[in-house]
Amino acid sequence: MNKIYSLVEDIYKVVATKEIPEDVDLYDEIDKFGEGCKSLMTKLFTEERNDGRKLRMSNIGRDDRYLWNAVNNSDVQEDMTPNTYVKFMYGHLIEEMLLFLTKLSGHEVTDEQKQCEVAGIVGHMDCKIDGVVTDVKSTSTFGFKKFKDGSLAFDDPFGYVAQIKGYAHSEGETKFGWLAMDKQNGHLTYLMYDSDDTQAPVHAKIGYDIEEHIERVKKLVEQPVWPEVCHEVVPDGKSGNQKLAVGCSYCQYKHVCWSGLRTFLYSSGPRYLTEVINEPKVQEVS
């Protein structure tokens, strides 16, 4: 059985050469991949969507006000747009494909969607690859860089570290990692952290006690008053206007936190302005 350190190299090799390891049954894995996609589509189109009104392992690492809103204000969150649903569906299919390629390249995949629980918070890990608790991610080119250079722990707006720390902790493990794909270019990388490695540059960001973190968050969301905003506004270039930070611009509670928010459609995408000194010369939407 191959080791996880050669995972990306082995996947690249198998797709380039079509040389399947002797101990891998190609047609069996293809059948399993097809069944996995079928199961995924069945789940997406038949199960009720989560209303977000509770703490889960997948959101436990998000910013404090986001979590407070998720528990106490979920009825005022923005509706998800159809294209966002398509984007998430596409991401799930990519993740299914990556696990297929992992198995096809001779690596062991176990514990898929295994339920985990820490301090009363429940979640389901993606899997273990070669015994390492692993999350599989499809990312933008920009997001991929953080997995490639190992800087994710320093810029983790979606709480990926806390999520996977919870899964690993429930298994009695300190090592965990992400198999990530740049969905625009097809590049792959594997990032592994070890929360017991005190010499690692990221240790100050990942070495915390996940049970203590969860208990703090559970108390926080029970408070009657919401916490401070997650991110302060930032200048919109040299216009004199102020806009939401990236972490807030993607949040479905931004209009709750920032009353009077105005949205302008730039060629690069929507820009959310909290203060307008100079009116942008682009379309505004309500």
Identify what each model region corresponds to:
Residues 166, 170-286:
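Metal-dependent nuclease catalytic regions and adjoining charged, substrate-binding loops involved
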Residues 1-133, 140-151, 158, 286:
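Metal-dependent nuclease catalytic cores that hydrolyze phosphodiester bonds in DNA/RNA
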Residues 87, 156-160, 202, 206-210:
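Residue-level preference for long, well-ordered alpha-helices that form the structural scaffold
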Residues 91, 95, 160-164, 210, ...:
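A structural signal for well-ordered alpha-helical scaffolds and beta->alpha junctions
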